[in-house]
Amino acid sequence: MSESSIKIENVVASTKLAEEFDLTVIESEFEGAEYNKQKFPGLVYRVSDPKAAFLVFTSGKVVCTGAKNVADVHTVIGNMAKKLNSIGIKTMENPQITVQNIVASADLHTILNLNAIAIGLGLENIEYEPEQFPGLVYRIDEPKVVVLIFSSGKLVVTGGKSPEDCERGVEVVRQQLDNMGLL
């Protein structure tokens, strides 16, 4: 299966850049940083190249969201560490970056009968309540992802830890629908 069958929409990753941060110092030094501990315990900071957003916590942990690929996550976290160092905040060398979640989209290029899919996939693996939500929610054990299936043939894959997890999730759906004669 070609890598182009999915489009990564969002990568969420976390790391620990320091033992602790003084978020008021970072807020005062980083243009556009937002910190209001009465509303949220972390500082929010957005960057534009590559586009991503950070949640920075006093514990030294950083969550990066909004990146479109794993390489961009590494780039923006590296840039964040350099920026922190430039204002006198020492960061850890080579921090371990953990991808928490990847959201991807795909298109099967066909109209789908979600009622038939719900019956075919078995009610123990799916949630389908069209009055509540127009998509069918399909939980896959291997890879451990959730695939939202829409009657338009569009899919949203969430919960992947790698782009390959998302690719495999789409392939599982494609094979199962094909086996049921629903593609």
UniProtKB/Swiss-Prot annotation:
The signal peptide annotation in the UniProt record is none
Q: Which InterPro entries match?
A: TBP, TBP_archaea, TBP_CS, TBP_dom_sf
Biological process terms in GO annotation = DNA-templated transcription initiation
The chain's disulfide connectivity reads none
UniProt keyword annotations, A-Z: DNA-binding, Repeat, Transcription, Transcription regulation
Question: Repeat sequence: residue ranges?
Answer: 8-84, 99-177
Q: Single GO molecular-function term?
A: DNA-binding transcription factor activity
Residues in a coiled coil are none
**Which Pfam families does this UniProt record tie to the protein?**
TBP (PF00352)
Which branch of life, at top level? Archaea
* Annotated family: Belongs to the TBP family.
Q: Which NCBIfam families match?
A: PRK00394.1-2, PRK00394.2-1, PRK00394.2-2, PRK00394.2-4
Q: What does this protein do?
A: General factor that plays a role in the activation of archaeal genes transcribed by RNA polymerase. Binds specifically to the TATA box promoter element which lies close to the position of transcription initiation.
Q: State the name under which the record lists this protein.
A: TATA-box-binding protein 1
**Gene source species:** Methanosarcina acetivorans (strain ATCC 35395 / DSM 2834 / JCM 12185 / C2A)
Q: Which gene encodes it?
A: tbp1
